[in-house]
């Protein structure tokens, strides 16, 4: 989907340094100082307009959340939701997922969320998918031994691709649902895309996985 460019987005984000972290590389290994506590850190890669990450931060004050979205014109919408949520455990970062190791130390992130990521359907774009082994290698370094990846999508092809990619990477699949909203899963917080697609009758796919390090 084409994103409308907002030339004022960067300046708007920088008006709120308590929420928007302009230079996340400066805090690699020191995110506890940013939040002022030792609570676990969960990140959402591709946080879009921020409904999910703001909802999670509000529902779980004992966890620190960082929403990561590389497009500032999109992230500025997440900023508005963060301001409205008015929670101390949420920060926003504008970075490409390929650069995450520049922002976080090994094992510094307790959990990763991938919600409605771009499916990149063309074969030549496979490596751009956030569940591609190239990215799994990055996630493995960021997560501790017990760390998990939680993935949601409405795209069955991407979900099937991800199941195979995770399995071939020798990850342990701890939860799989082919119709999340009609399952027994509790505590789901919807994204904007999730509300849109589920309202049209599309099933939502979800999986949870962790790296097998035994």
Curated annotation (Swiss-Prot):
A GO CC annotation given for this chain: tRNA methyltransferase complex
HAMAP family per UniProt: tRNA_methyltr_TrmB
Family to which this protein belongs: Belongs to the class I-like SAM-binding methyltransferase superfamily. TrmB family.
Domain of life of the source: Bacteria
Function: Catalyzes the formation of N(7)-methylguanine at position 46 (m7G46) in tRNA.
Keyword Methyltransferase: yes
EC main group: transferase
Name listed for the protein in its UniProt record: tRNA (guanine-N(7)-)-methyltransferase
Alphabetical list of PANTHER family matching this protein: 3-DEOXY-D-MANNO-OCTULOSONIC-ACID TRANSFERASE/TRNA GUANINE-N 7 - -METHYLTRANSFERASE, PENTACOTRIPEPTIDE-REPEAT REGION OF PRORP DOMAIN-CONTAINING PROTEIN
Binding, S-adenosyl-L-methionine: 44, 69, 96, 118
Known catalytic reactions: guanosine(46) in tRNA + S-adenosyl-L-methionine = N(7)-methylguanosine(46) in tRNA + S-adenosyl-L-homocysteine
Molecular functions (GO terms): tRNA (guanine(46)-N7)-methyltransferase activity
